[in-house]
A protein has these predicted regions:
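N-terminal intrinsically disordered, low-complexity segments enriched in P/E/S/T
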Residues: 1-154
């Protein structure tokens, strides 16, 4: 059973494209639709989201700056939300999670954020330019993807 679990995670974490901190590779059906940077996101309407995240390390307060994922998707292709039902998110650390399109379509729910208390999010290597998925209606933050590098539509 352990071998099967490891094989499944290896399959989920493989990628034909090189992932880079500070960039989000957008893929669907094995095709690359584009690459987004913080500068690209900053061209879209920004929102501030205050939240407290509960995790094994305790509670942390945040005031994120970012943009709704729906706005990001519509800037790439307004039909994406109709063509696909799920988005697999991946970080540079190979953390992989999933977001249902129905969650993305809910108002005030799924965001790509790039700053906390007005300061750029740090990359895994300590630089500036990281991005993160937050799901506002997920109080424990278990599906938040830090160091976001990939969105794969399914």
């Amino acid at each position: 059973l352990l071998v099967v679990i490891i094989a499944v995670f290896a399959l989920l974490n493989r990628s034909g494209e090189e992932l880079h901190e500070g960039e989000i590779l957008i893929e669907a059906g094995g095709n690359t639709l584009g690459v987004l940077t913080v500068a690209d996101l900053q061209k879209l309407p920004a929102v501030q989201k205050k939240m407290v995240i509960q995790s094994t390390g305790g509670m942390t307060k945040h005031e994120f700056t970012g943009t709704p994922l729906l706005d990001v998707l519509n800037s790439i292709d307004p039909g994406l939300t109709q063509k696909y039902t799920r988005i697999i998110t991946k970080g540079i650390d190979n953390y992989t999670s999933g977001v249902e399109m129905s969650e993305v379509l809910k108002p005030n729910n799924v965001f790509i954020v790039y700053a906390d208390y007005g300061k750029p999010l740090q990359t895994k290597t300590g630089g500036e330019g990281a991005m993160r998925i937050i799901i506002y209606q997920d109080e424990f933050g278990q599906r938040f993807t830090n160091f976001l590098t990939s969105l794969e539509f399914q």
